[in-house]
């Protein structure tokens, strides 16, 4: 059986990879994928702690996080499609040049 410590280390590694991806990458789609990876690493932590403590609160909270992540992905991708139609690029530097 895999220990809690292993799950927490895996979650920290996934979160770190996601954070580095958000900070380094310029492509908005890749940034969204890295944010989703970070959310999934938090979900892994919730599930591992929920199983370790014998409490279902962490598992219930994961459903809410997954719902918010799905909504965030839908809105983010819709914005990226609209931006691509407008500028024909999804580079983050081009988004900074946009004015309201």
From Swiss-Prot:
Belongs to the complex I subunit 4L family. NDH-1 shuttles electrons from NADH, via FMN and iron-sulfur (Fe-S) centers, to quinones in the respiratory chain. The immediate electron acceptor for the enzyme in this species is believed to be ubiquinone. Couples the redox reaction to proton translocation (for every two electrons transferred, four hydrogen ions are translocated across the cytoplasmic membrane), and thus conserves the redox energy in a proton gradient. GO terms for biological process: ATP synthesis coupled electron transport. The lineage of its organism: Bacteria, Pseudomonadati, Thermodesulfobacteriota, Desulfuromonadia, Geobacterales. Its EC number is 7.1.1.-. Coiled coil: none annotated. NDH-1 is composed of 14 different subunits. Subunits NuoA, H, J, K, L, M, N constitute the membrane sector of the complex. It holds the Pfam family Oxidored_q2. This is NADH-quinone oxidoreductase subunit K 2. It is a multi-pass membrane protein. The chain crosses the membrane at residues 4-24, 29-49, 60-80. The keyword Transcription does not apply. Keywords: Cell inner membrane, Cell membrane, Membrane, NAD, Quinone, Translocase, Transmembrane, Transmembrane helix, Transport, Ubiquinone. It is an enzyme of class 7 (translocase). InterPro entries: NADH_UbQ_OxRdtase_chain4L/K, NUOK/Mnh_C1-like. GO terms for cellular component: NADH dehydrogenase complex; plasma membrane. Its main location: membrane. The keyword Membrane applies. The gene is nuoK2. It is found in: Cell inner membrane. It catalyses: a quinone + NADH + 5 H(+)(in) = a quinol + NAD(+) + 4 H(+)(out). One of its GO terms (molecular function) is quinone binding.
């Amino acid at each position: 059986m895999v220990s809690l410590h292993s799950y927490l280390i895996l979650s920290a590694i996934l979160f770190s990879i996601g954070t580095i991806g958000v900070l380094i990458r310029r492509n908005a789609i890749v940034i969204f994928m890295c944010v989703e990876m970070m959310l999934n690493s938090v979900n892994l932590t919730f599930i591992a702690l929920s199983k370790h403590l014998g409490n279902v609160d962490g598992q219930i909270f994961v459903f809410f996080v997954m719902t918010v992540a799905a909504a965030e992905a839908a809105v983010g991708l819709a914005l990226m499609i609209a931006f691509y139609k407008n500028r024909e690029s999804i580079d983050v530097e081009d988004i900074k040049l946009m004015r309201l």
